[in-house]
Amino acid sequence: MNRWRTASTRYRPAATITPIALKSTERVPYLVTQAAAPYEGLRRIPVSVLLHDVRSLYNVGAFFRSADAAGCEKLYLCGITGRPPHAGISKTALGAEDTVPWEHHPDPAALILNLQRQGHEIAAVETSIHATDLYDWQPRFPVCVLFGHEVDGLAEALLDLCDTHVRIPMLGRKHSLNVATAGGVVVYELLRKYRALFDNATKAR
């Protein structure tokens, strides 16, 4: 039996949407062809990601894929973090390593200081007691978010250089997320926050 679904008009109230008859196993064509329409003016958002000592190539590839999907400006790969070309990265990046600009930096501290001089807010994603809840955080764009080693996190020396620490709220008992999963949560929240600023600026014109 076919199901009828109507694409949301939340962000484009003037659009004319035709209901699409779908089988339960079919994908919604709207998501493929029109979902990016409200974001056409954004292109890349002023968000970059710094990975320091992320040991899993699969995690690195997943970061590339999330950065591509959310429209991030760049990935900075530091320490032992793997870098393209590598089959392990490609397996989860699915080609995103070719679409997202990236740089390798042996000295993350020097990179952080340079980005701060350029006006970036540097935010460490960590579980420190002084960290701000991700959903309460009011970032100052452009922003560079830092993620560290899957077990050890970010080194204290790097945490001390950051302008702010941000934590993802954890309601379960494990109090942890895979680092690449955490990356997806953070960059999409930054996309949401930046789009709100973009929409407000557009309305004010």
Q: What is the role of each PLM region?
A:
Residues 1-205:
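Post-transcriptional modification and biogenesis factors for structured RNAs
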